[in-house]
């Protein structure tokens, strides 16, 4: 029998008596703030393109592959994470993410771009996926009385990673140089620094004992799986899963397209004006987008508790389409308008990620919702290819045709508007899951009575 002070046989080390659950959010943040560096990849794009003679499409490839591997490793590694626990998952994330930078450093030093793609994109991408899902699940277990806040904390950290990485990466490139040697040194420092920072999370993380104290009631309560739910396998057979897949894919495609190209995009939009954007200012813009991304994850997901998941996605997708139209039509006329619209879009992008677990819970219940979430993240993998591909391919073709400035992005912004409309329609098609898909978990406890007004509200959220 495992005691609270000894490592659990499955699921990793269990917290000893008296262990504060408030030590767990910093552990989760140390992982998510590190792997959130992926959102600052656009800072490296100009240096890679000039130092290694790459096109915009080529310089986006490591980022695209990293997002693909994030979704795939999250989808297929979820069972391993649950079986081996958060410390194992965080260790794997640390090793893969840091090694990815070290391999990329070797690739930059030897001008072998395929090593950068392999290191950052493939190896580092596995670290992204395993690291992304491990703190979310653990925090939900530690905070059964505040699951929305717990999810927001973890996913907010991922969104805020570039807030630190963007100016830090830009400063290193300024110091080391933007040639292949400077890029290699920057990658090397990133790999070593993130290894140290992520190790703090590995050391701090613990899984909760069987009972977690509810701070509001002061009582210790077990939180079992109750009532009916939908298994991960059955969820794949429902139209609701695929509607949400389209919703997430469209929302992420629209956000990730502008995020991956953020630094060069704002520079190109105002290159021909009296107030061009410097490299440092462009990096600052990326940091602002990361702040909006981070704030949206906790702000909009909390708002969804008040107005419902379906309504909040109506905001993400409907208002987001309007923001893209404003940028495409008037973005080059006003720098504040461009920045404001981009910030709103990135807040919706982050909010979409943070709200989707609750949306899944509303539709499919808590039984195997983590596995369902992991499978849904394949939409992120798809979007990680679509978004940058659309923006970069169109920009490259426009540049080859002799266009410059905002003309490089007009068509891609219009495409993003259309994708958000598709996502809006998919969200409108979401309905409650048919009872034939429900199963009773083998370890389920009798469900507590649900007040009628709350039951009706939860049902309405899926309408």
What does each model-identified segment do?
Residues 41-46, 166, 233-300, 387-392:
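Extracytoplasmic gate region of multi-pass secondary transporters
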Residues 158-209:
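Helix-loop-helix hairpin linking two adjacent transmembrane segments in secondary transporters
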Residues 191-220, 423-431:
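C-terminal membrane-cytosol helix-exit motif in multi-pass small-molecule transporters
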Residues 248-257, 281-356:
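C-terminal transmembrane helical hairpin of 12-TM major facilitator-type secondary transporters
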Residues 95-109, 319-332:
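C-terminal ends and interior cores of transmembrane alpha-helices
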Residues 146-167, 374-388:
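Glycine-rich segments within core transmembrane alpha-helices of 12-TM secondary carriers
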Residues 48, 129-143, 150-151, 351-364:
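Intracellular juxtamembrane helix-capping segments at the cytosolic ends
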Residues 64-79, 287-299:
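Central cavity-lining transmembrane alpha-helices of secondary-active solute carriers
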């Amino acid at each position: 029998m495992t005691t609270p002070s000894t490592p659990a046989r499955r699921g990793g080390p269990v917290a000893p008596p008296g262990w504060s659950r408030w030590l767990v959010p910093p552990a989760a943040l140390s992982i998510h703030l590190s792997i959130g560096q992926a959102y600052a990849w656009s800072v490296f794009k100009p240096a890679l393109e000039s130092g290694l003679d790459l096109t915009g499409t080529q310089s986006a490839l490591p980022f695209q592959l990293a997002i693909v591997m994030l979704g795939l490793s999250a989808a297929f590694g979820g069972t391993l994470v649950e079986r081996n626990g958060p410390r194992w998952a965080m260790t794997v994330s640390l090793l893969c993410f840091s090694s990815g930078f070290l391999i990329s450093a070797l690739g930059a030093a030897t001008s072998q771009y395929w090593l950068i793609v392999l290191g950052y994109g493939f190896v580092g991408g596995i670290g992204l996926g395993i690291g992304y899902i491990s703190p979310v699940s653990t925090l939900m277990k530690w905070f059964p009385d505040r699951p929305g806040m717990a999810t927001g904390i973890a996913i907010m950290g991922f969104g805020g990673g570039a807030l630190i990485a963007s100016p830090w990466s830009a400063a290193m490139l300024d110091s080391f140089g933007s040639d292949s040697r400077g890029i290699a040194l920057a990658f090397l420092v990133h790999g070593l620094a993130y290894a140290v920072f992520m190790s703090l999370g590995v050391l701090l993380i613990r899984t909760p004992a069987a009972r977690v104290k509810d701070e509001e009631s002061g009582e210790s309560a077990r939180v079992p799986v109750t009532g009916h739910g939908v298994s991960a396998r059955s969820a794949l057979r429902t139209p609701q899963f695929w509607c949400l897949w389209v919703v997430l894919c469209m929302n992420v495609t629209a956000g990730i397209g502008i995020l991956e190209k953020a630094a060069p995009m704002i520079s190109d939009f105002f290159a021909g004006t009296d107030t061009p954007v410097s490299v440092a200012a462009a990096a600052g813009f990326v940091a602002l987008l990361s702040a909006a991304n981070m704030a949206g994850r906790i702000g909009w997901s909390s708002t969804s508790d008040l107005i419902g998941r379906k309504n909040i996605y109506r905001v993400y997708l409907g208002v987001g389409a309007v923001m893209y139209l404003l940028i495409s039509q008037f973005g080059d006329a006003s720098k504040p308008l461009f920045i404001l619209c981009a910030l709103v879009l990135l807040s919706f992008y982050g909010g979409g990620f943070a709200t989707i677990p609750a949306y899944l819970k509303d539709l499919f219940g808590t039984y195997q919702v983590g596995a369902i979430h992991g499978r849904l993240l394949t939409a992120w993998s798809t979007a990680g290819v679509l978004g940058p591909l659309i923006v970069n391919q169109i920009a490259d073709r426009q540049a080859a045709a002799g266009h410059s400035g905002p003309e490089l992005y007009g068509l891609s912004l219009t495409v993003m508007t259309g994708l958000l409309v598709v996502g809006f329609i998919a969200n409108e098609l979401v309905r409650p899951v048919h009872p034939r898909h429900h199963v009773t978990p083998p370890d389920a406890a009798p469900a507590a009575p649900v007040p009628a007004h709350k039951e009706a509200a939860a049902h309405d959220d899926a309408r």
